[in-house]
Amino acid sequence: MTEQYYKIALLFNANKVYDRQVVEGIGQYIQASQCMWDIFVEDEFIYHTDTINQLSIDGIIADFDDPKTVELLQHTLIPTIAVGGSYKQADFYPHFPYIATDNMALVEMALSHLQEKGLSQFAFYGLQVNTHKHWSIERRDAFVELMEKNHYPIYLYEGVQVHAQNWLEEQQKLIVWLKSLPSHTGIIAVTDARARHLLQACEYSKIAVPEELCVVGIDNEELIQYLSRMSLSSVEQGTREIGYQAAKLLHKLLNGQKVSHTPILIPPITVHSRNSTDYRSLTDPLVIQAMHYIRHRACHRIKVGQVLDHLETSRSNLEQRFKNEMNKTIHQVIHEEKISRAKNLLQQTDISIKEITEICGYPSIQYFYSVFKKEFEMTPKEFRLNC
């Protein structure tokens, strides 16, 4: 029996990384199942409200975090699968089958990551309460619940939407809050975009990350990684799995099978640990200052002498402090920062090895190969191929 063709509308805004990855997951299901679907998306990947009315649509998968989508589809009789963020209150879910990112699990994973780094003070940077962004409220409430459950003090800051007119004012307010936090606090940002605000504010106000404050975001958005000097640790959501499961449910509906309306919660995948949470339990203020200087300048071919000049201290004094705090020499730490930067660039970018050699401050590609192979027992090229 030949399977019927169906015209399917995907109502997503592909300018958002969450939506793009959900759509990728839908595509993965279509490829895997070979279902006979004719997918409709707008050319600019932003749907318009008259889409449903103008086309003979057989099925819909839609982003129900968007209030316009909820309003458009609330009375539709077309088979529909909703995706979005989870709710603590079950009656908040729509009357459609629903695939959700698990907001509590996202915050729990971020918190566990910070705890594993040795931190014991935590804060949350979110958005001011807005019913149109319920996922922000749910993540904030999850953080508060976890703090109360574990008897931690609660540090919260909720920023407004930022635009050119209020950017400097809002950054100053954020800096005031950051300076009020206890030293060695781990901050969970509601999104990677908000995490970037934190990194900018810390750099502007000379707060050392991760020595004084650590930052972890949510989304693992590739674009954000390129917009900050400090690489951002982030929780990767199971967005492709959300799309895959949504398409699978719609396929069942179209084939006349019964589908449960109990929301399916998809957990996050992992935390991508990067420099913003590369915390070491340092207590010596001079070592903290030195580490901050080294992190930002190791690839500028700095020598130990430049670190000493910056801190206006003697080599014997600082070397002893490094030995007491880290059991390492200053030179070892500079080397580690350079090689770590090179490793991350090999893993996360397509930049040529020659260019990475220059970026990381190695005098020649031959020297870089020698140092890298000694550290990892493989060449940079072999390392990249194995990533």
Curated annotation (Swiss-Prot):
DNA-binding region: 305-326, 353-376
InterPro entries given in the database record: Homeodomain-like_sf (IPR009057), HTH_AraC (IPR018060), HTH_AraC-typ_CS (IPR018062), LacI/GalR-like_sensor (IPR046335), Peripla_BP_I (IPR028082), Tscrpt_reg_AraC-type_HTH (IPR020449), XylR_PBP1 (IPR054031)
One Pfam family cited in the UniProt record for this chain: PBP1_XylR
Domain HTH araC/xylS-type as annotated: residue spans: 288-386
Paired cysteines (S-S): none
GO biological process terms held by the UniProt record: regulation of DNA-templated transcription
Molecular function in Gene Ontology: DNA-binding transcription factor activity; transcription cis-regulatory region binding
Alphabetical UniProt keywords: DNA-binding, Transcription, Transcription regulation
SUPFAM superfamilies, A to Z: Homeodomain-like (SSF46689), Periplasmic binding protein-like I (SSF53822)
Function recorded in the entry: Regulatory protein for the xylBAFGHR operon.
Name this protein carries in UniProt: Xylose operon regulatory protein
Organism: Haemophilus influenzae (strain ATCC 51907 / DSM 11121 / KW20 / Rd)
